[in-house]
From Swiss-Prot:
Lineage top rank: taxon: Eukaryota
Source species of the chain: Caenorhabditis elegans
Name of the coding gene: ham-2
GO molecular function terms attached to this record: DNA-binding transcription factor activity; DNA-binding transcription factor activity, RNA polymerase II-specific; sequence-specific DNA binding; zinc ion binding
Composition bias, Polar residues: 112-123
Disordered: annotated segments: 106-130, 278-303
Protein name: Zinc finger protein ham-2
InterPro entries in UniProt: Znf_C2H2_sf, Znf_C2H2_type
Length: 392
């Protein structure tokens, strides 16, 4: 095919024949798309028993009516299943018995097949085996290898090749020669036998092959059905309305917020924990801007004021603690001195009482009245007059 060399994933190149019209495709996804568009025109929803015209309508129907965003399509009969387990049960039953099996089905397809087709219903899909699939993959690898002529250039022309291979190599191309060499290689045969011994069972091989080839996961999003919503009549039931958050609308209406400040106060500069902090009332708050108003700006400003008050209280508390430490130190020093004095004088002496001061006697001299004899006589008479009488 001309477009095989332009594929983005050359490792996925291969031949995927359609079991209905025998067309061959390079990718399994191309085969699946072909089967959905050419052979399966309508579906029947098993939940609500509605007829669905196409695959795109099936996806939108499951998304809108039943709120199902993921479903797994069988590439053999294009039935839709809710999970991989149901799909594998269906495929195992198709391989063993030729019947769909008892699995949960979301939608069944109605195929439109020509009269010349071999299989007229999805239940009559041709069975396959792991051995045939392995040989098919080996042939695909051989067909994709375009450099075999450069790897074995002499074997094609060697006369001894007839003894090695009983086939006629004269008319073989590089890819056909590689297929024949792989089929007759004893090392490859031993490797296949070892792989067959290590293979646990055919059921596991079939399930792995089914998971690699026959399951198609379909995810539906709003973007997938956007085109269909615009082109068709939309019922009120299927409209998805995206409401704008009320908080955003409130912010848009209240975008102009006036923040009151003290314009007349000078900037405040203080030191907290050995860090200089300069607070200016002219600077805008980082939590308030003209273009965007944060919902928690008021709470942030309240927290900042609370932190400022806490720092001031903390500074006062530190000063009080320092003063208390100084008082405690002085008390300890005085207590040490008292203990030392008690050790020196175990019995304290009573305090010394000084005598009361006496009347000062006048100094002898010519100006002293008591030195006069007349004055002395008057004093003696006064003393005798004031003396009490003695009773016999």
């Amino acid at each position: 095919m001309p477009y095989r060399a332009e594929l983005k994933r050359p490792d996925l190149k291969g031949s995927f024949p359609c079991s209905i019209c025998q067309k061959v495709f390079c990718h399994s996804s191309s085969l699946s798309r072909h089967r959905m568009q050419a052979h399966f025109k309508s579906y029947t929803c098993t939940t609500c028993n509605n007829e669905i015209p196409s695959n795109d309508t099936l996806r939108s129907h499951m998304y809108r009516v039943h709120n199902i965003t993921r479903m797994f399509m069988c590439r053999c009969c294009n039935w839709a299943f809710p999970d991989k387990t149901s799909l594998h049960i269906h495929m195992q039953s198709m391989l063993k018995n030729g019947t769909p099996g008892e699995a949960a089905v979301l939608a069944k397809s109605s195929d439109v097949v020509d009269s010349t087709s071999e299989s007229g219903s999805p239940r009559q899909s041709p069975p396959f085996s792991p051995d045939l699939l392995m040989q098919k993959r080996m042939l695909q690898v051989a067909a994709n290898n375009n450099n075999i002529g450069s790897i074995f250039p002499t074997l094609l022309k060697s006369p001894d090749s007839k003894s090695m291979f009983p086939l006629d190599l004269s008319n073989m191309g590089p890819s056909q020669f590689l297929s024949a060499w792989l089929a007759n290689n004893p090392i490859n045969t031993a490797a296949l036998n070892l792989a067959a011994q290590q293979t646990p069972s055919k059921d596991s091989i079939q399930s792995s092959n089914i998971s690699d080839y026959d399951d198609l996961e379909v995810q539906t999003t709003e973007e997938d059905i956007k085109f269909e919503v615009e082109s068709s009549d939309v019922s009120p039931r299927s409209v998805i309305v995206k409401t704008e958050p009320t908080f955003k609308r409130e912010l848009e209406h209240d975008a102009d917020i006036d923040v009151e400040g003290d314009d007349g106060e000078p900037p405040l500069k203080m030191t907290i924990d050995d860090k200089n902090i300069h607070i200016s009332h002219d600077q805008p708050s980082p939590t308030v801007s003209d273009s965007h108003i944060s919902g928690g700006s008021s709470s942030h400003s309240g927290e900042s004021l609370k932190c400022f008050d806490c720092q001031v209280a903390r500074g006062k508390l530190v000063a009080v603690e320092d003063k208390c430490r100084a008082y405690e130190k002085t008390i300890r020093e005085l207590q040490v001195q008292v203990d030392f004095l008690r050790k020196i004088q175990p019995n304290p002496m009573p305090p010394v009482m000084l005598p009361p001061p006496m009347m000062p006697m006048p100094s002898p001299g010519p100006n002293n009245l008591f030195q006069n004899p007349a004055m002395r006589m008057l004093l003696n008479n006064l003393i005798h007059m004031n003396r009490p009488s003695v009773v016999p």
